[in-house]
Amino acid sequence: MQLNIIGAGLAGCEAALWLADRGVQVDLYEQKPTKFSPAHKSEGFAELICSNSLKAERPDSASGLLKIEMKMMGSHLLDAAETARVAAGGALAVDRDVFSTAVTEMVEKHPNITVHREEVTALDESAPVLVASGPLTEGALAQAVAALTGDHRLSFYDAVAPIVTAESLDYDKVFAASRYGRGEADYLNCPFNKEEYENFHAALIAAERAPLHDFDGDLTVYEGCMPIEVMAARGADTIRFGPLRPVGLRDPRTGHRPWAAVQLRAENTARTLYNLVGFQTNLKWGEQKRVFSMIPGLEHAEFVRYGVMHRNTFLESPKVLTKQQFLADHPNVFFAGQITGFEGYMESAASGLLAAHQILARLQGCELPPPPAATMCGALLDYITTPNKDFQPMGANMGILPRTEEINTIRDKRERYMALSQNAQDAMCAWTEEYK
């Protein structure tokens, strides 16, 4: 059995090591040092760019649960992370250089992995191939991917609004309605009075913005969508006549039209997550929490994702990718990592593990169902392959896990999350036992 893997990032290395352990002859292609992306600096594999934190380890946290599931699936990168661990309280943080060196050595010393330090410019569909080229995929490879998926199915920039959990909203203030009462009440609305709006506007235009990385470039040229803080700076009423326009809405508390209103749109079919419509932003994350918590009804909102605007090459996965992580119209071409819409270091590595399981099944002539949606891995996979007219990448969070009626009755948040985590662990344990 033989497989080509393109990209020696977290997803590619995780997949390569897992498959090689099971007798697959892996040819791993990495363009460094022949060619560097604008973000990468070292020749090592699994290079961490923006942070050395691999997030929380608590089992009642989304990140902690994800790591538990990855261990059940046979993660090698978590072993490497342990050797590179640095003190970080309840989080798993690593020395980036030590981590990258550990992963590189694991890969280069494995007898079933052959490393090719060269750029890949075309995709050979004659046999299974795994594309794990990352969020900065560009040039000939990006063109090759676009040729298979269609140019309109490959995005090159993220402009994402914040996402909050439904259970953290204040429904004494937030109300469901569509403008003018047309159709179903598909939106949740957060109504401002004049004073609330003016205070929010002042805080928004004064908030500190995140610096763009060199590789992000001028995003507005490509996005055609303006950050909410930039729009607000144009005038006191600009956003009130834009994304915060209150026309067609009536606040049930007052019986009148609000001065302004933020609309929340469901992010998933279970309606456990909502995004802030029109709130693409480049504010620092701490500022987003501070300023957006001034929105009526969001005072205690739990943000599962903050808004970002950055360079990010990713597939419109719900339109092109199966739950087995291959292209629906090109079944020998598998994808893993951030290019699929898995957002985050550990999420990327997890998607590599998931793809590896599917590829081994293919090479053995078997079919493998994905992990149950009750698991964090299964929920993420379900998210990126479920139709969504405004698809954006997603990281691990408790909001994407399905809830049972019993879990919904648990009032304490930490206990509720622990119950979700235990359900997920049980489901992943059963899946790995059945399909190991």
PLM-predicted stretches and their roles:
Residues 109-290:
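Predominantly flavin-linked oxidoreductase catalytic cores and closely associated redox partners
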Residues 348-370:
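Internal hydrophobic alpha-helix adjacent to the cofactor/substrate pocket in enzyme cavities
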Residues 391-436:
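C-terminal auxiliary extensions adjacent to catalytic cores
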Residues 3, 24-26, 129, 154:
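Hydrophobic anchor at the start of a short beta-strand
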Residues 1-11:
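Beta1/beta-strand and adjacent pyrophosphate-binding region of the FAD-binding site
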Residues 57-104, 108:
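A conserved beta-strand/loop capping segment in the N-terminal third of enzymes
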Residues 276-342, 349-351, 369-386, 391-397, ...:
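A glycine-rich dinucleotide-binding beta-alpha-beta segment and adjacent secondary-structure elements
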Residues 17-79, 373-384:
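N-terminal FAD cofactor-binding segment of flavoenzymes
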